[in-house]
Design a protein with these regions (language model features):
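Bacterial N-terminal signal peptides
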Residues: 12-23
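A short beta-strand-turn-helix
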Residues: 62-81, 110
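Short active-site neighborhood of thiol/selenol oxidoreductases, capturing the structured segment around
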Residues: 76-91, 116
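Bacterial N-terminal signal peptides that target proteins for export
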Residues: 2-13
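Thiol-based oxidoreductase modules, predominantly thioredoxin-like and allied folds used
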Residues: 106-135
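Non-catalytic, surface beta->alpha helical segment in thiol-disulfide oxidoreductase systems
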Residues: 142-200
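Typically the conserved alpha-helix immediately C-terminal to a functionally engaged Cys/Sec
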Residues: 94-111
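N-terminal "domain-start" segment that seeds a small globular fold
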Residues: 32-71
Length: 228
């Protein structure tokens, strides 16, 4: 009887085989618009620290907090709109900026492909929602059902026919927690940018295929299951 995989990575690769993802991984690798599964992490990209105690990227959207205008600006620039909720003292928010977005290839990809509007979960700035309602940041978070931070909300790239609406109807995917690894974060943004959710709503299948790609690119001694 063959031995069972024991390490987490071997389990993941076994799942990829069991789910028939070898072909999917090859297809994704051959896709001309799919970016590399990883890239250079140096030079590191340190965040800014704002007066309200939040970490911030210098390229975050300079917004007047009218989300309709932010969407239009993102679309005109060929980007996707994402709204990021954070709060002061959030360790996962700090890690997002100091660990994940500090990696050069991740920072570059998100900056080049997304217009990110940062909001404070407890903030008092007035925000105009897509339906024209004007609410404080904290009231908007409550309206949208945002409880944890960091939470990112990705919007569809075309809101034709949805004018005057707000909420989940405008969102591209189900919300996922952002307290995860750099690779998962990167894969999620690629998955959304290229609208791969239109092929398969299951992000995990895409992510597992990308893990397999990364493993295949490692030198042989670094691959899981190698013994001396």
């Amino acid at each position: 009887m063959p031995s069972l995989p024991t390490s987490p990575m071997r389990v993941i690769l076994a799942l990829a085989v069991g789910l028939g993802l070898g072909g999917l991984s090859a297809a994704l690798a051959a896709d001309p618009v799919l970016p590399p599964p990883s890239g250079p992490v140096l030079p590191r990209m340190p965040p800014l620290r704002t007066d309200d105690g939040l970490y911030r990227q210098s390229w975050f959207q300079l917004s007047f907090l009218d989300l309709r205008d932010d969407f239009a600006d993102a679309k005109a620039g060929g980007k996707r709109l994402a709204v990021l909720f954070e709060q002061r003292g959030c360790v996962y928010c700090a890690s997002l900026h100091n660990d994940v977005l500090a990696a050069r290839y991740i920072n570059d990809y998100v900056r080049e492909n997304f217009a990110v509007v940062q909001l404070d979960l407890w903030g008092a700035r007035e925000v105009t929602d897509f339906d024209g309602s004007v609410l404080a940041e904290r009231a908007l978070a409550e309206r949208w059902g945002v409880i944890f931070t960091p939470t990112i909300v990705f919007f569809k790239d075309d809101l034709t026919g949805l004018e005057g609406k707000w909420g989940r109807e405008l969102e591209a995917i189900e919300r996922l927690p952002l307290s995860f690894s750099a690779d998962t974060f990167y894969d999620l943004f690629v998955w959304v940018r290229l609208k791969l959710y239109e092929r398969d709503r299951n992000f995990q299948r895409f992510h597992i295929a990308r893990i397999a790609e990364r493993e295949a690119l490692k030198p042989a001694p670094d691959r899981p299951g190698r013994t001396n």
